[in-house]
C-alpha cells in the first residue's frame, strides 16, 4: 500500500527518524485505541532522548486520541464487523445511517448537528454501528467516561490553503499516484478487498473498476472527489481543535519557526 497511503520517500525518511510508517499489515485488526496506547508508549521513550517531538497528521481522530485521550471501547467480534461490511457493500451508506439512528438516536442527532459530514463517512459509521451491535449499548454511552492526563504540552500548528489551490493539489496528487502505479498496486490487493484496511479512498474506487462497475476514468474522478471531501471533513475537524495557530501553507517557514520558538520559551 506504499502508493495509496503516500508513504514518505526514502529521502524524506532519511531526513529525520520516523515512526509508525508501514508498521502494520492489512490483515491486522487495529483501532484508534491501539494507536493511542502505542503512540503514548513511543512518546515516553522518545521524551527520554529529547523533550521536543513532532507529530504530523493526518486523521483528526487519531491526533485527538494522542493529545486528548480516547474512551475505552470493548473489543468487537470480527464476525459482526464482517457482517456490517457485507451489508454496507450491498445496501450502501444509508444502511449504516438507519442503523445508527435506530440504535443510538441521541448520537445520530449529535453527529447530524455538529459534524454532518461524518454521516457520509463509511469507516466512522461502521465503527459506530459495530459498537452498538457488538455491545448492545449505544455508542454514546462509552463517550466521556474517562479523564485523561498527558505528561506533555502540545503546540498545535495548522496549515491551510485557498480551497481552489487545495483541490488542484489534490487532483494533481491523484494523477501522480496513478502514474506511479496505483492501479497496479490495487490490483495486487484485489483478492483482499473485503478487509477493513482497504475500505479507504483510493482503493475502494478502483476495486469497483476491477469489478467492472465503473470505467477507469470514472474511478479516478471518484478518487479525486472523495479525497476532496475527505480534506473538507478534516479541515472541519481541525478547525474545532483548541489552541491551534493557523498559517497559510505558503507562509515563509521562518515566520512559523519563530512563532514555535516563542511558545517553547514560555
Residue ranges with predicted function:
Residues 1-266:
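Phosphate/pyrophosphate-binding catalytic cores of soluble transferases and nucleic-acid-acting enzymes
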Amino acid at each position: 500500500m506504499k502508493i495509496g497511503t503516500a508513504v514518505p520517500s526514502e529521502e524524506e525518511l532519511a531526513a529525520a527518524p520516523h515512526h509508525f510508517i508501514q508498521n502494520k499489515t492489512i490483515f491486522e485488526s487495529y483501532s484508534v485505541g491501539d494507536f493511542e496506547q502505542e503512540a503514548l508508549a513511543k512518546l515516553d521513550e522518545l521524551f527520554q532522548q529529547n523533550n521536543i517531538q513532532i507529530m504530523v497528521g493526518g486523521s483528526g481522530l487519531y491526533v485527538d486520541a494522542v493529545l486528548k485521550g480516547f474512551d475505552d471501547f470493548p473489543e468487537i467480534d470480527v464476525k459482526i464487523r464482517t457482517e456490517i461490511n457485507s451489508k454496507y457493500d450491498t445496501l450502501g451508506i444509508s444502511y449504516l445511517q438507519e442503523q445508527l439512528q435506530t440504535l443510538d438516536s441521541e448520537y445520530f442527532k449529535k453527529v447530524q448537528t455538529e459534524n454532518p459530514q461524518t454521516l457520509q463517512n463509511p469507516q466512522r459509521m461502521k465503527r459506530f454501528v459495530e459498537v452498538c451491535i457488538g455491545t448492545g449499548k449505544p455508542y454514546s454511552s462509552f463517550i466521556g467516561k474517562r479523564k485523561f492526563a498527558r505528561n506533555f504540552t502540545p503546540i498545535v500548528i495548522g496549515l491551510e490553503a485557498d480551497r481552489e489551490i487545495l483541490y488542484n493539489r489534490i487532483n494533481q496528487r491523484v494523477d501522480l499516484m496513478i502514474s506511479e502505479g496505483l492501479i497496479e498496486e490495487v490490483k495486487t490487493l484485489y483478492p483482499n478487498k473485503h478487509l477493513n484496511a482497504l475500505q479507504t479512498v483510493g482503493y475502494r474506487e478502483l476495486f469497483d473498476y476491477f469489478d467492472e462497475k465503473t470505467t477507469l476514468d470514472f474511478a479516478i474522478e471518484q478518487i479525486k472527489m472523495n479525497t476532496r471531501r475527505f480534506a473538507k471533513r478534516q479541515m472541519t475537524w481541525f478547525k474545532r481543535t483548541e489552541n491551534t495557530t493557523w498559517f497559510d501553507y505558503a507562509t515563509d517557514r521562518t515566520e512559523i519557526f519563530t512563532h514555535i520558538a516563542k511558545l517553547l520559551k514560555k
